[in-house]
From Swiss-Prot:
Keyword ATP-binding: no
Official protein name in the record: Multidrug resistance protein MdtK
Annotated membrane topology: Multi-pass membrane protein
Domain of life: Bacteria
CDD domains membership: MATE_NorM_like
Keywords: Antiport, Cell inner membrane, Cell membrane, Ion transport, Membrane, Sodium, Sodium transport, Transmembrane, Transmembrane helix, Transport
GO BP terms in the entry: sodium ion transport; xenobiotic transmembrane transport
Cellular component GO terms held in the UniProt record: plasma membrane
GO molecular function, one term: antiporter activity
Location(s) in or outside the cell: Cell inner membrane
Listed transmembrane segments: 11-31, 53-73, 93-113, 127-147, 160-180, 188-208, 243-263, 276-296, 314-334, 357-377, 387-407, 418-438
Amino acid sequence: MQKYTSEARQLLALAIPVILAQVAQTAMGFVDTVMAGGYSATDMAAVAIGTSIWLPAILFGHGLLLALTPVIAQLNGSGRRERIAHQVRQGFWLASFVSVLVMIVLWNAGYIIRSMHNIDPALADKAVGYLRALLWGAPGYLFFQVARNQCEGLAKTKPGMVMGFLGLLVNIPVNYIFIYGHFGMPELGGIGCGVATAAVYWVMFIAMLSYIKHARSMRDIRNEKSFGKPDSAVMKRLIQLGLPIALALFFEVTLFAVVALLVSPLGIVNVAGHQIALNFSSLMFVLPMSLAAAVTIRVGYRLGQGSTLDAQTAARTGLSVGVCMAVVTAIFTVTLRKHIALLYNDNPEVVSLAAQLMLLAAVYQISDSIQVIGSGILRGYKDTRSIFFITFTAYWVLGLPSGYILALTDLVVDRMGPAGFWMGFIIGLTSAAVLMMLRMRYLQRQPSSIILQRAAR
């Protein structure tokens, strides 16, 4: 029992800074929306449309680079710290190549935006302008993620938290300058949010790089030599590990986007109620997602040390803590669902629907916690390919079709509207949780030599 208590303390010590970093990141998006809305409703809508395209593109790169965390954690645990700098250099090369692809996609996103049904031309122009300003921040964002993953792989999660709040503090005044045109800068409205956010990502990267350069704990792995050439073997391995994570993230983001589009013809009340419940459940998701990042670090580190039993302890402890958190947040959601909905909107119909959907959200929080922490465990074992297949099957083969049938057809029951899609979420997330646990159990039952051989690759 004592080893589980000790492991839980270490997991929470790693997870809490990640939670706070995610809060800072979410707050940046909130600030952009509010400040753009203060300028005009059109600018706020342009930022919202631009963000809906930016997120899938940049999260694909983000997911690809998540491969660095278990690699570095395993090298750290095995005492091969001298190899970490080379892995990080290749991470920067990979981020550079992905940045170019993301920038090309975002530069040409105008074709997607202008093809939207009945979109106002002025709104489309502002959304395109926002993306074309923001895309210059893509390299800064991805370079920052490489540096952050280096720190987190070494069990240093506080720097990411500090840089997140630094970015938030810088974002507010820089937004003000470029939205309203102060200190000699042009008045750009919502496009100014894109300029500000791009600048903030570069500030965060430079600050993180400065920390790494001066941190005593990283003195032995600091790269003082030339940057070096791309290493095709290392980059291939990072892509093999990272691509399934990137695709899983992409399919998860696009799933919720598709559901939002399917709900949109059902009327303003349904759209608003769905959005409130989804926004709140996304905030609650920060907790298990951050714990999953901590579990990846601990499992990778323990496997690096050559202890499959300690890796199992880390995995089981992470799941136990995650389920306890989910039970607490589910009770909180059920108890205060009407009060929470009133914070977003005071329309009685919207509040009533949002409160009903939050009941379903409370049900799936436990499944969601298990599946996302399960994904973190599998990342720690470097078994990322299964994450993609499980996510795709659970979300797109089981969750979305069942949600569509329940919400918009009479095949099983009378049309349920948005609640049908939320039943689909429950089916998809529960399926993912079960499949993740089965895969984890299969991996942990293999001989230690095979587990450690996979982890050392």
